[in-house]
Amino acid sequence: MSNNEIVFVTGNANKLKEVQSILTQEVDNNNKTIHLINEALDLEELQDTDLNAIALAKGKQAVAALGKGKPVFVEDTALRFDEFNGLPGAYIKWFLKSMGLEKIVKMLEPFENKNAEAVTTICFADSRGEYHFFQGITRGKIVPSRGPTTFGWDSIFEPFDSHGLTYAEMSKDAKNAISHRGKAFAQFKEYLYQNDF
């Protein structure tokens, strides 16, 4: 592995494309370039509401699978409904799989409060075996599905600062500028450019 290679553990092709777009954008910082390597490992998901604990469990599994000394990161995303005290949270993937987008929207139908927050938590294990966390949060509301339904729950989440568009209706660059994932990876990218890893 070269000095600036890091491994991203994900089997989600859409997530990989989005992260590549964010992390590999040119940054004028000591001519440092990040080389992203993808590993699609099958990691067990800790069932918990603590997003750092979930990300750390996945990070430790990734280090165990790939071997110590390789900079590696994992990412976990949650969708928290205000009306449900933060649920489904990290369980959103399972809600999507078992219910689908339409039924998730219907869950909030009886309630006036449709507000939610999208959260991305990154766990990065550096080459020294130290773990670092980065988190991005975007506030918004749950709406009936609009736009392409090819990327998780993007078509039902309308950020407050999106001018009335769901994530799915936004351009990639516009979404990355305000999204939970974009915010978390902006922090992570800054860390990578300022530190040896």
UniProtKB/Swiss-Prot annotation:
Whom does it interact with, and what assembly results? Homodimer.
Q: What is its EC number?
A: 3.6.1.66
Q: Which reaction is catalysed here?
A: ITP + H2O = IMP + diphosphate + H(+); dITP + H2O = dIMP + diphosphate + H(+); XTP + H2O = XMP + diphosphate + H(+); N(6)-hydroxy-dATP + H2O = N(6)-hydroxy-dAMP + diphosphate + H(+)
SUPFAM superfamilies for this protein:
ITPase-like
Pfam families, per database record = Ham1p_like
Q: Give cofactor(s), names only.
A: Mg(2+); Mn(2+)
Q: What InterPro entries does the record point to?
A: ITPase, ITPase-like_fam, RdgB/HAM1
Listed Gene3D superfamilies: 3.90.950.10
Keywords assigned: Cytoplasm, Hydrolase, Magnesium, Manganese, Metal-binding, Nucleotide metabolism, Nucleotide-binding, Nucleus
Cited function: Pyrophosphatase that hydrolyzes the non-canonical purine nucleotides inosine triphosphate (ITP), deoxyinosine triphosphate (dITP) as well as 2'-deoxy-N-6-hydroxylaminopurine triphosphate (dHAPTP) and 5-bromodeoxyuridine 5'-triphosphate (BrdUTP) to their respective monophosphate derivatives. Xanthosine 5'-triphosphate (XTP) is also a potential substrate. The enzyme does not distinguish between the deoxy- and ribose forms. Probably excludes non-canonical purines from RNA and DNA precursor pools, thus preventing their incorporation into RNA and DNA and avoiding chromosomal lesions.
Binding-site list for Mg(2+): E45
Q: Where in the cell is it found?
A: Cytoplasm; Nucleus
What is the species of this protein?
A: Saccharomyces cerevisiae (strain ATCC 204508 / S288c)
* Any one GO CC term of the record: cytoplasm
One of the GO BP terms on file? nucleoside triphosphate catabolic process
NCBIfam families, sorted: RdgB/HAM1 family non-canonical purine NTP pyrophosphatase
Which amino acids does the record list as binding ITP?
10-15, 58, 76-77, 93, 151-154, 175, 180-181
GO MF annotations in UniProt: dATP diphosphatase activity; dCTP diphosphatase activity; dGTP diphosphatase activity; dITP diphosphatase activity; dTTP diphosphatase activity; dUTP diphosphatase activity; GTP diphosphatase activity; ITP diphosphatase activity
Family from the record: Belongs to the HAM1 NTPase family.
Q: What is this protein called?
A: Inosine triphosphate pyrophosphatase
- According to the record, how does the cofactor bind? Binds 1 divalent metal cation per subunit; can use either Mg(2+) or Mn(2+).
Task: Please tell me what else the database record remarks about this protein.
Answer: Present with 3490 molecules/cell in log phase SD medium.
What is the protein's major site of localization? cytoplasm
